[in-house]
Amino acid sequence: MLAPIARGTWSSISNLAIEAFVNCCDSREQMDIEVEQNKLLLQERTSYFISLLDEYKIPYYSFQNGFFVTLKFANPNPVVEFLMQDHIYTINCNHGVRVAVCSLNKKELLKIANKVKEFIQITCI
């Protein structure tokens, strides 16, 4: 029973942030425009990151949409630890490393792709 409680507590949206977002807009139309701009920005970042992963031949799970891209690794612990040495913080999940594309700019996404590529080359995975 802990999982639903934890998910509702820690994985839910920030009500204060949503209230601030809603209150900063003068109209519903303005808010809709901002939401659309943010969707496009997220799609642009994700497309860029996935193009780097494809170019570097870094495996990742199928991506449709969302805030995260998950890289495929049977044992993600060494990858996460390697990235942390450069202050790159990802999420360790079952057979993968989750990258929060939503919070990163292109320069940071390039850095992550290069570090993962370096990890693969060093470890000969």
Residue ranges and their predicted role:
Residues 1-125:
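PLP-dependent class I/II
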